A protein has these predicted regions:
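C-terminal substrate-binding/catalytic lobe of Rossmann-fold NAD(P)-dependent oxidoreductases
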Residues: 2-68
């Protein structure tokens, strides 16, 4: 599972609180069996099946988009 969130270049936090809230809701619905990973740029391995990946993009004037 992956959450990709996008916001304008001036947003200070990454990942956003909304992205973390989405991950919390998903994890709770699935019995709290998952863990979150942010920034996999230093890993060269398969994703753990019990992992919720969170990616953040900051740029331009994007008001806020979240994809699951």
């Amino acid at each position: 599972m992956e959450i990709v969130e996008k916001h304008h270049k001036h947003k200070l936090d990454a990942p956003s609180g909304t992205a973390l809230a989405l991950a919390d809701s998903m994890n709770e619905a699935l019995g709290n069996a998952y863990h979150y990973t942010y920034d996999r740029s230093d890993r060269r391995e398969e994703r753990d099946p019990k992992e919720i990946g969170i990616s953040a993009v900051r740029g331009g004037n994007i008001v806020g988009e979240h994809e699951v």
